[in-house]
């Protein structure tokens, strides 16, 4: 049995401080056959979580301690003409635009959110945080 307590969280924060990425993952899966996303992530201010998405599943973000923003993005597609008057080629350019910022802080009663399937997102850590 795994207990999520102050001792475990303090240990994760200490390991995150030693990690150049300023974060530490704790895998809570109990077997190799378990392919679920069962992990704790200790995140320190300054960590960079690349903007990413999960095309086939939602992501539940539960903040156990700390303060952070979950930032959601949408794809913006633009088509531009490249070339001269003799040969025109159309280039497809994809960019991401921030559409929503969800502030999470358990002491303010804001415990988590659900990121929709396929939604681009990242986090901005305001103070040391642990998410499940």
Predicted segments, located by residue:
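A short, N-terminal "cap"/entry segment at the start of jelly-roll beta-barrel domains
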Residues: 1-36, 50, 81-104
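Short beta-strand-initiation
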Residues: 23-26, 36, 46, 56, ...
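Short, surface-exposed beta-edge/turn micro-motifs
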Residues: 36-38, 57-59, 110, 128-129
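His/acidic/aromatic-lined binding-pocket segments of jelly-roll/cupin-type domains
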Residues: 40-41, 52, 58-63, 113, ...
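Conserved short histidine dyad/triad with adjacent acidic residue
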Residues: 40-55, 76, 106
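Conserved metal-binding segment of the jelly-roll/cupin
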Residues: 46, 104-127, 131
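General beta-strand recognition
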Residues: 50, 69-71, 130-132
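Glycine- and acidic-residue-biased ligand/ion/polar-headgroup-sensing regions
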Residues: 56-78, 83-89
């Amino acid at each position: 049995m795994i207990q999520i307590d102050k001792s475990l969280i303090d240990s994760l924060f200490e390991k995150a401080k030693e990690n150049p990425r300023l974060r530490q993952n704790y895998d809570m899966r109990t077997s190799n056959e378990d392919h679920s996303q069962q992990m704790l992530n200790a995140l320190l201010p300054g960590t960079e979580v690349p903007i990413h998405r999960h095309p086939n599943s939602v992501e539940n973000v539960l903040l156990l301690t700390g303060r952070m923003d979950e930032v959601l993005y949408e794809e913006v597609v633009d088509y531009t003409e490249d070339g001269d008057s003799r040969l025109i080629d159309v280039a497809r350019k994809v960019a991401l635009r921030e559409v929503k910022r969800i502030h999470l802080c358990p002491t303010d009663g804001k415990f988590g959110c659900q990121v929709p399937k396929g939604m681009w997102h990242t986090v901005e850590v305001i103070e040391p945080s642990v998410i499940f």
